[in-house]
Each structure stands twice: as C-alpha cells, then as structure tokens.
Regions:
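Conserved NTP/Mg2+-binding pocket subregion across the NTase superfamily
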Residues: 71-183
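Structured mid-to-C-terminal alpha-helical surface segments
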Residues: 206-230, 234-278
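Catalytic metal-binding acidic patch
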Residues: 32-68, 72, 81-88
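Amphipathic alpha-helix face/heptad-repeat signature
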Residues: 8, 162-165, 191, 265
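Helical scaffold of the NTase/Pol beta-like nucleotidyltransferase catalytic core
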Residues: 1-31, 61-63, 278
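Internal helical hairpin/lid segments
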Residues: 166-209
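Amphipathic alpha-helical segments within well-ordered protein domains
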Residues: 17, 196-199, 214-218
Length: 278
C-alpha cells in the first residue's frame, strides 16, 4: 500500500497494534478491505474497512475491550469512519454465506456509532448479505496488514451463494425509499456504481472498485440485459453508458443521476443476475 496517504497508513498500524494489545496471540490476521483493498480509497469520502481474524471465539469482555480501544474516541479515524468486523479463523476459511462474525464496530467522526456483539444480534432489516460479499472481496482483494495472504485467510463463496447474496443486496437497496422527481439525487451515483460492481462480479468473476466496475461495464458494450419480468434494457447501450458516465463524474463533483434512473438500472441488473438462478 505504498500509495496510501500517511495518516491512513499510521492509523492502520495503530489499529493493528491496539488489537494485538487486546487479543494477543489470538489475533492471527488483520486485513484492509473495501476501498483500501480495491485501491480506490478517497480521503474525505471513503470509509476504512478492516477485518480482523482471531484464532478462537471471543468472550464478551474481550469484545467490549476491543471496541473500547478501537472506537473513534479512543483511536481517531482519519476517514469518514471505520467499519470493523472480527471473524474466527474457521469462519473466515469456511466460505459460508452467513454473517458469522464475533463483533462488529462502526465508528467515526461522520459515522453513527454502532457495536453489534454477536452475529445473531444483527437485524435482518439491516441486511445479512454484507458479510459473505465482504469476505468474497477480501479473498480476491484484501490487503494483509498482519497474517497470511487474504486469499488464504478467506474462502470465496460458492457460485450459488454469490448469486443469492448479490440478488439479496440489490433487493435490499431497491426496498429503500427512492428520491422523487427527475432532478439529481445525491447518493444515486453510488447506487448505480454499486450495481455495476455486482454485475461485473457476476459476469467476469472479479471484484473491482465502483468506478472501475462502471468503466468495465462501458467497455463491455453490453448493458444490463432485459429479461422476463425485468426492466427493459436500452437496446444500444447508449443510455446505460451515459448513466454510468454521469455516475462516475458525480463522484468527482458532477451532478448525480436521478433516483428513478438509478432504480431502473438496479432493476435491470437484478433481472440479469436473478435470471441465472431461475
């Protein structure tokens, strides 16, 4: 990670040191995930995603101590916030689609604090698909801060589980309220590019950053396909290309697409991925 800015590099080193203080030899791996692992970290915009791997289950006291040491008030995060998940080694290596975590922490100057002390406490309404997909990304793109390479520490999902979690994620996003009207809707660009990432993973088997996935989809020359029961795809791909290009530009300060545009594209992507499972 030679291209990381110094504040983030120092933060990750301090985070691993603090985790080692709490867990000792039970800490067998630490991995940068998300935008850091995918080489797309943007200071001021991105979160810091970290997965820790422990040898054995953690009792509640150690989970609480870990959260106390790593929350923003104790270890200030230089990004929007930290999203940290701790897995047992056997869970990380299992390829399970289930959440399976020991403890989860969200914390930061611009992120609401949240600690979830066990996977069974995670509300289904908040999405249970995140963890299997995150571990799939870690398998391909995780950066080892401590321990063996991420490809050894994390198993990938089976094709059937991957497809199910991708469709679960798209349905979850589609169930959120849609900004009304045809004007620019902040956040719609991430909805479009997130769907691009899912579609590229489904078509090509690789995880890319959101922007790189959008560019890959444009290079495909093949938009999200129309299927029975799905939204009609643009037959030429021009409308899709324009939507993706505007979404990429929005991440650099341009106007985002509208909510209905983003939803229509998400439905196209869902229709293509779900059709393979029918």
């Amino acid at each position: 990670m030679t291209d990381l800015d110094p504040p983030l590099r120092r933060y990750l080193a301090d985070l691993v040191a603090a985790a080692r203080d709490v867990l000792g030899d039970d800490l067998v791996g630490a991995y940068a995930a998300g935008s850091v692992g995918l080489g797309a970290y943007q200071p001021g915009r991105s979160d810091v995603d970290v997965a820790l791997v422990c040898a054995d289950a953690l009792d509640l006291g150690r989970r609480q101590e870990l959260v106390a040491r790593l929350r923003h008030e104790a270890l200030p995060c230089p990004a929007r916030g930290l999203e940290l998940v701790v897995y047992r080694r056997e869970v990380a290596r299992s390829g399970t689609p289930e959440p399976g975590f020991e403890v989860e922490l969200n914390t930061g100057a611009r992120m609401p604090f949240r600690a979830t002390w066990a996977a069974v406490d995670r509300p289904a309404r908040d999405g249970l698909f995140w963890y299997g997909l995150d571990r799939s990304i870690l398998h391909q793109c995780g950066y080892a801060l401590l321990g063996p390479p991420a490809a050894e520490a994390f198993a990938d999902l089976s094709p059937a589980d991957l497809r199910r979690l991708l469709t679960d994620a798209l349905r979850w996003w589609l169930a959120l309220p849609t900004p009304p009207g045809d004007g620019p809707a902040p956040g719609a660009e991430d909805a479009v590019l997130g769907a691009c990432r899912s579609l590229v993973r489904f078509r090509h088997g690789v995880w890319l950053s959101k922007v790189d996935a959008g560019r890959r989809l444009i290079d495909d020359g093949r938009p999200a396909e129309a299927t029975a029961g799905g939204a009609a795809a643009d037959p030429t791909g021009d409308a899709t290309d324009d939507l993706v290009e505007r979404s990429i530009a929005a991440r650099a300060g341009g106007p985002p697409p509208s909510g209905p545009e983003a939803r229509a594209f998400q439905r196209q992507v869902l229709a293509e991925i779900a059709a393979e499972a029918a």
